Amino acid sequence: MADTDIVRAFLAENAEGDLLAWSHQVEAMRRFGLSCAEAEKIIFRAGLLPKRYQRNRRMISTAQQERLFGSRVAVVGCGGLGGYVLEELARMGVGHLVAIDPDSFEEHNLNRQLLSSPSTLGVGKALAVARRVGEVNPAVEVRPVQASFVSDRADALLAGAAVVVDALDSVEARLELTAGCAKLGIPLVSGTIAGWFGYVTTVFPGEKTLERLYSRWSGGRGIEAELGNPAFTPAAVASLQVAETVKVLLDLGTPLRNRVLCVNLLDMDVESVPMDAFPTSRS
């Protein structure tokens, strides 16, 4: 790799204030034999900001943007919720993503799943994520895992993740995921959707939020199988999950801890429900 001081001098010469345009980042990659991620790392260390993140800066500082770039987030489920979550995390500049899903795209996904199209039918969802992120933000590293999450493999699948995002479509899998996150001490941002409705909650290690939320679940398919899933509900709930994820990564604001944000898009009503409203154990 080229001498970092020489690279920094090139970047400083071509910066617009403290912003560096994509064309100059590409030229630095070509001239000095850098990967996109290597170039972006040097840009941040030089006190500069890639211009793609310019509109983030009124919300977060350059130092916080660099922190996002150094963060790893695992997303379990790459369909309706997960596709939007992964796209938004990549656009926000989270530098390391793990995309976990055993399935491939089918025709019934076309109405709502961001990464599904006639050209991706039959393509593994996790692999489609890697391709899409490579197009949207090539500096982001994606590890696609074409497999189901199982708690026995939690160490391998979630290693190094600062946050895990639950974008699953079954209660059983969701409870297994929360157990794996608890074991590893990783915060979990959980979301689910059904028809016009959805919820988001954030579970920190030691909390039993999902166990209480599903205390009366008796097995079988979730309510989404009855109410269906349109295009807009996953987009709305996924955006809330990404906001929660960024807050946890950067220690900003007030997370949805020990409460559930219930979203009703039919009546345009949003309610924050404390966990005290739910049973304390499964019965």
Question: Which functions belong to the PLM regions below?
Answer:
Residues 1-73:
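N-terminal charged helix/coil linker that caps or initiates catalytic domains
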Residues 2-24, 144, 149-150, 155, ...:
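E1/E1-like adenylate-forming module used to activate ubiquitin-like modifiers
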Residues 40-41, 100-137:
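Glycine-rich phosphate-binding loop and adjoining beta1-alpha1-beta2 segment
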Residues 64-101:
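Glycine-rich adenosine-cofactor-binding loop
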Residues 85-86, 129, 177:
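Hydrophobic residues within alpha-helices
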Residues 95, 141, 187:
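Residue-level detector of anion-binding/catalytic polar loops
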Residues 252-263:
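Core catalytic loop region at the nicotinamide-binding pocket of NAD(P)H-dependent oxidoreductases
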